[in-house]
């Protein structure tokens, strides 16, 4: 974050990673089999202005391998190490978002356009500039990128400059602190298909600031299911914070330290803000 002028922003000093291996080719094929199963395609397809073909909310029943993989201790340790903070999937509906683009007439592109110094001069932006709804995202490529050119992520620094981050190859991942960095995806040219898998993450500790919003996913979700999972995890965070505060208060009493009115008022106001931010996301739209 310091290198792009955003030191102190977000919940981790790490902004974005280079691609790293996260899934084997065999694991990718198993995930693809679940994504393109009849049940998933029937119940879990969505579209938005960003992407006309998405699969979301597969859940453990329809996609047991995908769900188990993203919740495995080994994968969580790998993603947390790259993120620079312990993270967990935001909630089940975000395991995972599959973006599907198929070009039946696609011709391989072997030579990229000349770089004239403007990273976006070719006009090949795939998604508009935006901030993510969740603190971190992990993007995994599920397609063979051999004949593809492009597909990078463009980041806007605090000075307004544009940086490009190389996109992942099949089975590799890129981790981005997208809630706090303005970014956009650039189009990939060549190849018959481009299928990417995006899983959203939040801090594991209930005591770390969590500024998750539902703005970007409310219109592409089964709301009852999503709101149930969102409410559950927010209440769990609140419960753990209250239990921790109760424990610290008992310790204070046992040590015969005086009651700190200002400290407890500050803590209560923090929980009030947390509840109010949760309420703001629970819209009827």
Please place each PLM-identified region on the residue numbering.
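N-terminal accessory alpha/beta regions
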Residues: 2-13
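A short beta-loop-beta micro-motif enriched in histidine and acidic residues
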Residues: 93, 123-135, 161-162, 168-169
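Signature of the catalytic double-stranded beta-helix
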Residues: 14-97
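Short, conserved beta-strand element in jelly-roll/cupin
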Residues: 128-148, 200-203
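Conserved short histidine dyad/triad with adjacent acidic residue
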Residues: 98-130
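C-terminal non-catalytic accessory extensions
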Residues: 259-285
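Catalytic core of Fe(II)/2-oxoglutarate
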Residues: 148-253
């Amino acid at each position: 974050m310091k290198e792009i002028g955003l030191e102190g922003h977000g919940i981790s000093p790490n902004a974005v990673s280079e691609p790293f291996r996260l899934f084997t080719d065999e694991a990718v094929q198993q995930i693809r089999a679940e994504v393109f199963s009849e049940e998933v395609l029937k119940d879990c397809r969505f579209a938005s202005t960003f992407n006309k073909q998405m699969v979301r909310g597969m859940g453990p029943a329809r996609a047991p391998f995908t769900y188990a993989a993203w919740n495995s201790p080994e994968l969580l340790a790998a993603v947390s190490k790259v993120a620079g903070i312990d993270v967990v999937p935001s909630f089940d509906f975000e395991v995972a978002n599959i973006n599907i683009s198929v070009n039946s007439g696609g011709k391989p592109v072997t030579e990229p356009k000349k770089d004239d110094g403007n990273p976006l001069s070719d006009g090949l932006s795939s998604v508009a500039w935006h901030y993510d709804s969740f603190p971190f995202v992990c993007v995994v490529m599920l397609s063979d990128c051999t004949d593809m050119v492009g597909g990078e992520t463009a980041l806007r620094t605090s000075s307004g400059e544009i940086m490009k981050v190389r996109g992942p190859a099949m089975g590799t991942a890129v981790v981005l602190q997208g809630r706090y960095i303005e970014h956009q995806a650039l189009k990939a040219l060549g190849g018959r298909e481009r299928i990417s898998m995006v899983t959203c993450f939040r801090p594991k500790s209930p005591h770390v600031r969590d500024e998750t919003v539902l703005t970007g996913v409310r219109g592409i979700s089964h709301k009852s299911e999503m709101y149930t999972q969102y409410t559950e995890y927010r209440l769990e965070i609140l419960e753990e914070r209250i239990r921790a505060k109760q424990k610290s208060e008992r310790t204070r009493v046992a040590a015969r330290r005086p009651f700190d009115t200002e400290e407890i008022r500050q803590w209560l106001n923090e929980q009030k803000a947390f509840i109010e931010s949760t309420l703001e996301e629970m819209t009827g739209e």
